[in-house]
């Protein structure tokens, strides 16, 4: 076990406001060759929150962890994933 591994409580409310989401998207761009910006250019009607969700889904973050980050239920996150997939597929 890694004593430095984040605990579930460390994720709670991590992405609960737009300011935190903007910082996250800037970090995604920095680490992943402008992934978030490219996604927003490809699908301009994505909100900041939707773009953050897409980035987390792309990173294969567990649904339960994303739920903690946004202070939402796992079923809400699963529904959001399906709606975003439909929105993205409609643009392609």
Predicted regions and their residues:
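N-terminal regulatory/sensing modules of transcriptional regulators
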Residues: 1-18
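Cytosolic nucleotide-binding catalytic cores of signal-transduction proteins
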Residues: 18-92
């Amino acid at each position: 076990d890694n004593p430095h591994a984040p605990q579930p409580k460390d994720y709670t409310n991590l992405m609960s406001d737009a300011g935190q989401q903007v910082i996250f998207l800037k970090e995604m761009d920095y680490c992943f060759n402008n992934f978030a910006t490219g996604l927003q250019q490809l699908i301009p009607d994505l909100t900041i929150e939707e773009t953050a969700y897409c980035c987390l889904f792309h990173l294969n973050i567990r649904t339960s962890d994303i739920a903690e980050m946004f202070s939402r239920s796992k079923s809400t996150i699963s529904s959001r994933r399906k709606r975003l997939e439909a929105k993205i597929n409609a643009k392609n």
